[in-house]
Amino acid sequence: MIGLITGQVQYLMAPTACVMTASGVGYDIELPLPSFCQLRLNEQASIWTHFHVREDAQLLFGFIDRKERDVFRQLIKINGVGAKMALAMLSAMSAAELKMHVEQESETALT
C-alpha cells in the first residue's frame, strides 16, 4: 500500500519510532534500531515501509534499506512471529544474518 516515504524527519521518539512529513502529511513510523540510528532530525530521508493491519491497529513499519524490509516481510510469514517480534529481531541482528538463519531454519539462532 505505502511502499516508500521520502520527506523530512520531524520528530524522533527513542528508541525506535519517528514522525516524518511528506507532502504535508505526518507519518508515525516504527523502525528497527539500525534504521532509527541513521535518521537525523529535520533532515530529508527515504524510508521503505510496510503497512501492517491488525484488528485493533494500523501500523507503519519503516526501514532505511529495502532488503531489511524484505527480511521483515519474510519473518512475519513465520508462524508465531509477529510484526513487533520481527522488528525486535532486526534490531538485534543484521538483515543478512536473519535471512541466512531463516533460510537455514536455524531455530537456536532465532530464539
Regions of interest found by a model, annotated:
Residues M1-I5:
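Short coil-to-beta-strand transition motifs
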Residues T6, Q10-A109:
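Long, highly charged, low-complexity intrinsically disordered interaction regions
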